[in-house]
């Protein structure tokens, strides 16, 4: 009504609650003659709006409908295409409007489910970051840890279903969003584990097979590839950050190797190798109920590539793909 009174022409589009390639294309066709995109809804609506506005180079305003939505405060969106979730970098929103009336009226059951999901996602994110010695992204892990503790400490209060508790939840999520830009990756990874590729093998099984194959290729690759210092992170800085957080580095062997590579480069490579082997072990424990094919040759290369591409987390946090990226097996744009 306010838009009509202001003599604004507008297109009202009710979008499906899933960010798929087709839904995005439909939304783009509706918005191609518009000068502004305004999105009111949950995470999927937010993702669609961000992709549409970025594609058409339009300003956009986001209005979250749930206090547990965190996609509004990041620059990434995730769009499902067939069996793959693609991570799309989007423009910054012109405005993010948190309406207290909308947030306070959010459904209690959905809010609690959202809280549980967010808590598990951030715990997984924090765990991934300090377990992965090859993680080369400057983030304030201490702030992330503090915000996570704050979330836990206030968890019971946040379930009280009061207007104030929902607003407190939104404030905490905004702080969590500031602590890291890639928490949506954990969400996508969680979904990806439920998907199956065309080979009908569970995603986790493909991860395990891929990690085993890559671990076996490690020695051969190390011998034939030129390793350049600029392609590796500052391991000393990472080591200092981990030490300040009392991180357990038991899976990494720091024994120097007398070879053509200097000690600092070798320590980096050795850490990557051991993280890859540790990932294999972790996956084996997690997938103990799966029966793996006896003949590893049955695994097709394109299926392994699907494993690498299906979850953005594999690129942003996984020691497995960081390992093969660091030694030149995989080029990531």
Go through each PLM region and give its residues.
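ATP/NTP phosphate-donor binding region
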Residues: 1-36, 112-113
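Glycine-rich phosphate/diphosphate-binding loops and the adjacent beta-loop-alpha structural elements
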Residues: 137-138, 150-190, 194-197
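Short glycine/serine/threonine-rich phosphate/pyrophosphate-binding segments
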Residues: 44-51, 69-72, 186-190
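Catalytic phosphate/nucleotide-handling subdomain of diverse soluble enzymes
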Residues: 189-240
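A short, small-residue-rich loop immediately preceding and capping a beta-strand
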Residues: 31-66
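Short alpha-helical scaffolding segments that buttress acidic/His motifs in well-ordered protein cores
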Residues: 115, 119, 165-180, 211, ...
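A glycine/threonine-rich phosphate-anchoring loop and its flanking beta-alpha core
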Residues: 56-151
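C-terminal charged capping/lid subdomain of soluble metabolic enzymes
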Residues: 224-333
């Amino acid at each position: 009504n306010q838009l009509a009174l202001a003599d604004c022409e507008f297109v009202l589009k009710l979008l499906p609650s899933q960010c798929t390639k087709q839904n995005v294309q439909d939304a783009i066709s509706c918005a191609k003659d518009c000068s502004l995109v305004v999105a009111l809804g949950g995470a999927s609506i937010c993702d669609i709006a961000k992709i549409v506005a970025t594609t058409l180079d339009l300003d956009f305003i986001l209005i979250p409908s749930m206090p547990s939505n965190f996609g509004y405060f990041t620059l990434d969106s995730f769009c499902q295409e067939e069996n793959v979730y693609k991570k799309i970098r989007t423009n910054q929103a012109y405005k993010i409007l948190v309406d207290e009336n909308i947030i306070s009226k959010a459904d209690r059951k959905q809010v609690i489910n959202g809280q549980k999901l967010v808590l598990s996602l951030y715990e997984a994110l924090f765990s991934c970051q300090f377990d992965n010695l090859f993680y080369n992204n400057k983030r304030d892990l201490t702030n992330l840890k503090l915000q996570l503790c704050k979330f836990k400490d206030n968890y019971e209060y946040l379930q009280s279903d009061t207007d104030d508790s929902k607003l407190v939840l939104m404030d905490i999520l905004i702080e969590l969003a500031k602590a890291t830009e890639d928490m949506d990756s954990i969400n996508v990874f969680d979904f990806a584990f439920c998907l199956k590729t065309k080979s009908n093998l569970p995603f986790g099984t493909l991860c395990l097979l891929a990690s085993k194959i890559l671990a076996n290729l490690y020695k051969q690759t190390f011998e034939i590839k030129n390793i350049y210092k600029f392609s590796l992170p500052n391991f000393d800085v990472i080591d200092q950050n981990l030490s300040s957080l009392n991180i357990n580095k038991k899976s990494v062997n720091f024994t120097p190797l007398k070879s053509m590579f200097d000690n600092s480069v070798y320590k980096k490579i050795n850490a990557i190798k051991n993280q890859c082997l540790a990932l294999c072990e972790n996956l084996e424990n997690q997938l103990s109920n799966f029966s793996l094919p006896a003949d590893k040759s049955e695994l097709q290369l394109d299926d392994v590539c699907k494993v690498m591409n299906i979850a953005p987390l594999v690129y942003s946090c996984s020691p497995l793909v960081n390992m093969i990226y660091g030694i030149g097996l995989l080029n990531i744009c």
